[in-house]
Amino acid sequence: MVCVAPVAARVARRDTERVDECCAPRVPEGYDREFNARFARRLARQYRSDGLTPSAALVLDFAGSVGLEGASLLEIGGGIGDIQLEALKRGASHTTNVELSAAYEPEAARLLDEAGLRDRVTRMLGVDLASTPEAVEPADIVVLHRVVCCYPDYERLLGAAAGRAKRAVVFSHPPRTLFARFSAHAINAFYTLTGNPYRAYAHTPDAMIAVLSGRGLEPRYREVSGPWHVVGSVRA
């Protein structure tokens, strides 16, 4: 399973949840086109109805095991901010969301207002953490859910995330199977032909984990929900 373009139909919320909710294209312009206001509204509607997806719940469970009470959380590509909302409800002191697409902002603001939590969240738009990590303050826990499969240089991205993490990093990725790699190539070829900048990547899981290990974060948590593998690493 690899990242593909979002579709209008409602995404299943069981462990068979699709991978199409994860990925960003290479440039912000394409990102806004692919992940538009309609897509953001759908995610917000699903969250209001069903809560976190199973894979997002695993991400939050790991963060909880590290310790959310009084903690700061930084999420890269957090979209509507559903994981952050739940982290705040579990005792996190403050969260920061770094996002490339402006389409999520209206829905994120509405969700924050509904929860009465706007004053505990910072949302940064147009910041590429891998390129400008110094633009983002460090946090106790750094989250990258359904993000690394979209970024061409996972080493820079995860390295930057590790550099911002005081205590832990948790990320999710699709499996690197033969089918996943073939599908990624097929999807990317289609988008190239249609002039769409969206790209999907099936990075090697062990190589991604090694990036974090090389920066002092050792894997302590591995769980699977449908196509999503969740890895949590803590500061040694």
Model-derived regions: residue spans:
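A short SAM/SAH-binding and catalytic strip from SAM-dependent methyltransferases
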Residues: 141-153
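Conserved class I S-adenosyl-L-methionine
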Residues: 2-67, 71-79
